[in-house]
Curated annotation (Swiss-Prot):
InterPro entries from the UniProt entry: EF-4, EFG_III/V, EFG_V-like, EFTu-like_2, G_TR_CS, LepA_C_sf, LepA_CTD, LepA_IV
Function: Promotes mitochondrial protein synthesis. May act as a fidelity factor of the translation reaction, by catalyzing a one-codon backward translocation of tRNAs on improperly translocated ribosomes. Binds to mitochondrial ribosomes in a GTP-dependent manner.
One GO BP annotation of this record: positive regulation of translation
Family to which the UniProt record says this protein belongs: Belongs to the TRAFAC class translation factor GTPase superfamily. Classic translation factor GTPase family. LepA subfamily.
Cellular compartments annotated: Mitochondrion inner membrane
Major location category of this protein: mitochondrion
The name this protein goes by in its record: Translation factor GUF1, mitochondrial
Membrane topology annotation: Peripheral membrane protein
Amino acid sequence: MLKFRIRPVRHIRCYKRHAYFLRYNHTTTPAQKLQAQIEQIPLENYRNFSIVAHVDHGKSTLSDRLLEITHVIDPNARNKQVLDKLEVERERGITIKAQTCSMFYKDKRTGKNYLLHLIDTPGHVDFRGEVSRSYASCGGAILLVDASQGIQAQTVANFYLAFSLGLKLIPVINKIDLNFTDVKQVKDQIVNNFELPEEDIIGVSAKTGLNVEELLLPAIIDRIPPPTGRPDKPFRALLVDSWYDAYLGAVLLVNIVDGSVRKNDKVICAQTKEKYEVKDIGIMYPDRTSTGTLKTGQVGYLVLGMKDSKEAKIGDTIMHLSKVNETEVLPGFEEQKPMVFVGAFPADGIEFKAMDDDMSRLVLNDRSVTLERETSNALGQGWRLGFLGSLHASVFRERLEKEYGSKLIITQPTVPYLVEFTDGKKKLITNPDEFPDGATKRVNVAAFHEPFIEAVMTLPQEYLGSVIRLCDSNRGEQIDITYLNTNGQVMLKYYLPLSHLVDDFFGKLKSVSRGFASLDYEDAGYRISDVVKLQLLVNGNAIDALSRVLHKSEVERVGREWVKKFKEYVKSQLYEVVIQARANNKIIARETIKARRKDVLQKLHASDVSRRKKLLAKQKEGKKHMKTVGNIQINQEAYQAFLRR
């Protein structure tokens, strides 16, 4: 029989040489140390802020310097775009998903400790919903302007959004270390356009760290107010963003507005009414660091076991299940609606099942994408995808190709048209093939409504004429022209149809301005418009995947371009192929591919005239029969080439 002897406590000293024993019993984990630091910092020493900037003005670089100075990351040359987690974010130099990081900072002037939450927001208008939720979690923002470029369209749009939400703004001019910059001129732009005091403007170099610790961090502490939440109130949190983890499900980025929440608490989402248990909770430092609790004013993450990102609705309120009746839902929730739709089909039709799985996984990580299966008579099985904008669609396609190696045929982007019927009913059309065409289908239609946007463009004055002509040719309506400074920068405002914006308007704008123009826009509602469906026909059969909805004034020009372009990619057949463009049951353009001729006379003697005529007549009849019953073989490469810009 085995006997066990329990050693007295005094014998523990003989294990001192075993480091692991001491660590296990006497030291705390890094997460516990962080939580202990947080507990010692009062709410009035919290500062939640974001950085407002145009693309390439140095937002990610400044974020890196702040993380280095506050010892979140080690200072080294590899720290580039730490908060940009996605490969496509790093390559394009843009922020797509909102991110956050907690920082601990000791003010050298007073010796007080502060908890800073940097909320890195997307800057592009496609992700404006995420931007507004991120700003709602902040007390202030750094308005970052490039000293070499000055104020740009995105700077203006995001400034007004932050200003409208009541954020305290700190104007900062970046890249002051460059020799060719005119800091005084940029200061004048900020003062004149945003009416911010010149003495409040701080000059920094995000790349070298110049003035970041000396001037910017003290300004964040002095000028940005602490969170206004109440720790004694019932818990409620604002859902800022989410991303999908294969093991955890949806990970939620939240701002704790009131109260506190702990691991294992039972919570409920106000919009979906779904109930959950908190599986994990913590801060981003800069990656997920579990702390076991979050309290008023903090920005961190929650894992609730959501299996689908669609359950995580941006702007939703999360509350304690036991105190639902005592808790007021946070205002301002608005469901995000897709504004750009495309048809997507596998470049190789046999890959549909595998690609369907890849597509579903990627959609799990982006709850703003809508996904429906559809079938095309030309391209086979595919999907109808809805996006927040053209950049959103481009990023999704790039991620699908890079992360999963999937190749797609993407149809021409379309926008949602509103059809108003004579009986007062309305229908939103997102697929051009479903758009009413011809006199019979349009007889019950009272009006068609087309979405418009208000575009803000900044550009050098020398390109003003070219840009105005571009806007006018795209059915634009001028709103305002503002001259930003004596150096020739102009801000131009136009109403434009959304359909023209998604048809590579930004590329055309860059072309006519030699890359110097910038663009931002916001929704301007629907207007009654004279739009029709344009179809491409091959031997009388419409190719559904290539249909488009256009304004009546553009139909003839686009139709002629279509038939000429498609003719280039269709191989000749043994019979004549007719390519036509049709709108309102009327053929507006036509191209013909002549039949490939087979020499049936090569074995005949030259003098056998009757036999010659008989064979030619038989060939003619055969081709006529083939044309009526034959199916034209158009390969996938032809569609890809035609849809390529």
